[in-house]
Amino acid sequence: TFYEDRTVETQNYLAPGLTKTDKYSRTNRVFGIGINDANVEVFNDRQFRDEYDMLIKRILKVSPKTAFIFETNNDSYRKVRKKKYVQHPNGEVARKSFFMLADKHKAGVWDKFSIMGGLGSMAKWEKADLAKKDKVHFKTAGYQLLGDMFYKALMQAYFDHIADLPAEVPQAPQAIQANHP
């Protein structure tokens, strides 16, 4: 969770170099954050959105041309006692929060929660040896698979975008006129 007393740590972790103003260059930020913030017994989705909204505003203050992509949280389970886990509905609630933030900030969303199978899907990922026993985090192979899926989706969106651009008519090179006396 973003706290005021951790500003420098958060800035450096999420946006290295954020302290210097960069009003001209366009940067992209992918937010794949929030699973630990949402993996609590009582989840306040408004506070969740407000804290990430504050972080986004801080980034936009020094880098106004930044584009954002939000990665929704994954499905997760909550440990209630030793070796006893229950489905955690907060992933779905956090997912909706990311879509609301994306709408507000005209950002993209990669819906990891739905892609992995929605509520209850983390058990399948664990059974496939892609998730850790805590039923919150992934094993290396799971993170690599998700990274590959994200990359392919991003590249496909880019290729779709450039395919929709208007074709440019090639211009003939201008003849160079020599100044001869």
Predicted regions and their residues:
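Conserved SGNH/GDSL esterase-like catalytic core that processes O-acyl groups on lipids
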Residues: T1-D50, H137
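Generic beta-strand/beta-sheet core signal
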Residues: Y3, G32, E71, A94, ...
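Solvent-exposed loop/turn segments at secondary-structure junctions
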Residues: T7-E9, I35-V40, N74-R78, I115-L119
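A generic secondary-structure signal
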Residues: P16-K20, R58, A153
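Loop/turn elements at helix/coil->beta-strand transitions in domains of secreted/extracellular proteins
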Residues: Y24-R29, S63-F68, K104-G108
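Active-site segments of SGNH/GDSL-like serine hydrolases
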Residues: G32-N36, R58-E92
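Generic structural signal for well-ordered alpha-helices
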Residues: Y52-K57, R95, F99
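Catalytic His-Asp segment of secreted/periplasmic serine-dependent ester chemistry enzymes
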Residues: D75-P181
